């Protein structure tokens, strides 16, 4: 999970730079989905084959809608509108969504520590978005629409982690990913193909092609392989906590490449979100409370 979060953190500035140089957001999502499907089906030829029941194949389609299509479309299009720093910071809100959805769906208790963590994390997200709203139009700062889309990506992925946690534990990472990416490709292709056609490929630089290659191979294939492997043995909240690394990596790389501007409010937002998520992760689960009685 740590490796996946690090690769994803680096993907934000590289993906942003690719979208600044001729690759539109919808096309980049299509490249990720189609590239991921191709790589996972090829890789599955070299691992032990698993039989998947028909009901689970249908469930993989629903999982693909939440975990891939909604998540990647919202995040990538949001990243094209906002700064890599904002996108990276917003990814740290996922554990907060995990807490809320775990309470609603899995009936996990909301303790005072959890409640304080949610409040602090929400405050950090609001500060980040309000900063973008005040400074919209300033190069490298971001946009309210982009921030909200990135936030929606975290919500859709948290729904996927919570709802399909049992499904993921029944199969290997290769089986899960090859079916999810296949479904996502079939569902997204009719809508995304016009955006791919609109790209002037002859005008794209080698640097941009390499950035897209990183997004597909490392930011998609490797990351989802590592993430699913971790998800099979970890709880949704623990999986989501590794998003800590993403804003750290994204911020360092973005500022180094001159892709984003760093403001004081970004520091405050990061501190609030980190403290909030730390409190959420440190709080007791339903099982912990039951065992202590």
Where are these regions (language model features)?
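Specific transmembrane alpha-helical segments of multi-pass solute transporters/efflux pumps
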Residues: 7-12, 41-91, 127, 216-234
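Hydrophobic/aromatic residues within transmembrane alpha-helices
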Residues: 18, 28, 32, 78, ...
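Transmembrane alpha-helices of multi-pass small-molecule transport proteins
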Residues: 20-70, 97, 156-163, 178-196, ...
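Juxtamembrane helix-entry segments on the extracytoplasmic side of multipass membrane proteins
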Residues: 22-30, 52-58, 130-156, 193-213, ...
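Helix-helix packing/entry segments at the starts of transmembrane helices
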Residues: 30-31, 72, 87-93, 163-186, ...
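Alpha-helical transmembrane segments of compact multi-pass small-molecule transporters, enriched
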Residues: 35-39, 90-104, 119, 183-187, ...
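Hydrophobic transmembrane alpha-helices of multi-pass small-molecule transport proteins
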Residues: 40, 61, 110-133, 188, ...
């Amino acid at each position: 999970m740590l490796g996946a979060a690090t690769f994803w953190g680096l993907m934000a500035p590289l993906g942003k730079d690719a979208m600044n140089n001729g690759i539109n957001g919808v096309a980049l999502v299509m490249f990720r989905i189609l590239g991921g499907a191709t790589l996972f089906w090829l890789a599955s030829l070299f691992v032990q084959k698993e039989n998947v029941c028909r009901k689970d194949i249908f469930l993989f389609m629903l999982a693909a809608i939440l975990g891939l299509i909604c998540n990647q479309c919202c995040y990538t299009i949001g990243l094209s509108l906002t700064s890599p720093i904002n996108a990276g910071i917003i990814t740290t809100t996922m554990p907060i969504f995990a807490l809320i959805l775990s309470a609603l769906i899995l009936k996990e208790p909301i303790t005072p520590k959890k409640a304080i963590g949610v409040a602090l994390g929400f405050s950090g997200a609001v500060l980040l978005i309000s900063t973008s709203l005040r400074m919209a139009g300033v190069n490298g700062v971001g946009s309210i629409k982009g921030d909200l889309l990135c936030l929606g990506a975290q919500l859709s992925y948290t729904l996927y982690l919570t709802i399909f946690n049992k499904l993921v534990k029944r199969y290997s990472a290769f089986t899960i990913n090859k079916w999810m990416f296949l479904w996502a490709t079939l569902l997204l292709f009719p809508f995304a193909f016009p955006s791919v056609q609109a790209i002037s490929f002859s005008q794209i630089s080698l640097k941009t092609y390499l950035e897209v290659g990183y997004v597909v191979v490392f930011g998609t294939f490797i990351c989802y392989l590592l993430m699913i492997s971790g998800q099979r043995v970890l709880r949704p909240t623990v999986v989501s906590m590794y998003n800590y690394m993403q804003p750290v990596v994204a911020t360092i790389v973005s500022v180094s490449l001159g892709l984003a501007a760093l403001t004081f409010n970004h520091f405050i937002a990061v501190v609030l979100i980190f403290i909030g998520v730390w409190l959420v992760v440190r709080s007791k689960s339903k099982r912990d409370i039951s065992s202590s009685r």
